[in-house]
Amino acid sequence: MIKYNPAYLNLNERLSQIWLNKYTILFILAAFKLLFFSTSLRNALDVSKSYILSNCGTIDTMYSKTLNSTPHYIGVFGNYLINKALIQTVKTSLSTVSLLVYASEEILEFMVDFYLGTYECLLVAAIDGTVDTAVNATEKLIGFVNGSVGSIANDLDDGLNDLSKIINKAISAAEKVGSLFSDDDDDDDDDSSSSSKNIASVNLTIKALRNLYIPSSINDKLEKISDSTPTFDEVKNSTKNLIGIPFEKIRKEIKSINTTNIVGDPDVLYVPPINDNSNYQGICSANKNHITSFFYSMDHLLKVATIVCIVLLLIGAVVVLFPEFLEEFKLWKRLTQLREFYWYNKDLYPSSSELETINQEVKDPFNDKKNIIPDQFDVIAGYQTCFNPWHTRIVNFIEKIITYFNRSSFQNESNKRRRQWIVAYVASERALFILGIGMLAFFVSILQLIIITLLKRTFDNNSNMININSIANSSAVHSLKDDVSTWSNQVNLYIKQTEGNLNHQVFGWIEDSTESLNNTVTHMINGIDDTLADIFNGTLLYNPMKTVVSCVIENKLYTIEKSLTWIHNKANVTLPRINGDDINNLLSSSNNSTNATGSNNLATELFEDVIDDSKKIINKVIQTYHKSIIYEMIISLVFIGIWSSQIPIALVIARFKNF
């Protein structure tokens, strides 16, 4: 059984700490948080106002510089675009003239070929065909004669030999008959002997015919004539060269034209100078009163809103004391009833509903010390031990420590109980809640101070490493170059898309038509060639007929096909592109001028002022947060002080309390 232990607080003592309840503390913390937030916000507005007003001159100068230099850079940029546009226009015009010259040359050649080329082609074809036919006939005749005469001569020789033998036999028989007439006169004898001598034998031969042949030099001469006869392509090329002489001269003249000289010197174009109007009242300086009024109205509104909210929170902190008072009163009343019931009914443990039916005297909860019997079990102490175990452990732990270091001072029972009660009062649930909040807030404030100190040290070490010139010459310049390059790339993509749409929608039908016509012409030529081959292939008329058809029809079709191909290849538009590097070089050369150099120096000085002001603002912000952390630390110490104030309060109460 748990013995009586008075190390707990009665109703009056509990009510003395009611203002330390968690709800009131939360309202107070919310009020402090709102106050700190309002203070930080007001400091931020004050920093912004100071920064704007201190940099009014810089803002005015930069605004004036931008306003005064804008016409200059617009003029530089516009003159560049005008110059490039005119150059591309001249180039396009010259290219168009060159195409017209070429088209005129081709049309003239076609007309000459159409009217004179046909007859010229037929004439050349007739000459070539005649020579080729004569060469072929001569070759066949020579081959036939030279191959046939020899065999004919041999056959004739064989026949003549047989005939000679027969004749010789006849002559021999005649001579024998003549010898029978020996009585003729001498004259006759003389004539007969002479005749006999003349036809003594007959030898018939055609040896000369055997050596008969036609020499091949005739064929060589004909081939030489065929080789020396000009073809139609040679005649056509010769005519084309004669016609193209003036046109070629015109094209050379067009190519030799310098487009830059035609456009003229771009330096003649007017570029507005960079003005330095120091008498201009800047946009910031002219509105200082409005800026100050704006920040004042913001600060006033913030101050009024903060006061109203803090008052409401403090009222809420006071209001929550009443339900806490009632709850504490009801709890103590139930506990005292339970304790008295236990005293009158030793081993009885009635339920809460049964307590209401018991007819007993209700004790005064504010003056119940006389009812405590030290040797009996205390129900309130048991309740405290069961329902607040950690609080009981903390109280016992602190009591043991005090007892260990002060054994001689607390030997009697009264002092021991007084000591236990003081520890219980100081280590009550509400008091420990205040102590925990204060210690946690103090620890967080220490961490915040460490962070802000490291930040300030890093800023102080690195703030002097900022090189104004390197920043001005690197980041801004590279940013400008990157922006110009990005702009030129995007514009070129837009131009490319427009060029594609133009070629597809305007000239697309020309490409489709020329392709279709070319296919038709090719089909016609192949059909004509196939028809000629079917009719005349393998005959002497094939080549002459093919030549005639080529002169009359196919050459014209080939010319049309070539013209359609040329139109197909030339039927497109190439729009000029923008070169970002040229623009960057132009802007760089413009920045190197006297006015621009002075303006850049002024910009560098202004940039230095901005950097210095930025450093001051950062230092001010760091100091503001440092001050805010100090305030938070003070608040945490206040909470710890509130808890510490419970010690003298407990000592005073214990001085007049009877243990």
From Swiss-Prot:
The chain crosses the membrane at residues 18-38, 107-127, 306-326, 432-452, 633-653. InterPro entries: PRM1. Residues 39-106, 327-431, 654-659 are cytoplasmic. It is found in: Cell membrane. Disulfide bonds: none annotated. It comes from the Eukaryota. GO terms for biological process: plasma membrane fusion involved in cytogamy. Belongs to the PRM1 family. Involved in cell fusion during mating by stabilizing the plasma membrane fusion event. This is Plasma membrane fusion protein PRM1. It comes from Vanderwaltozyma polyspora (strain ATCC 22028 / DSM 70294 / BCRC 21397 / CBS 2163 / NBRC 10782 / NRRL Y-8283 / UCD 57-17). The lineage of its organism: Eukaryota, Fungi, Dikarya, Ascomycota, Saccharomycotina.
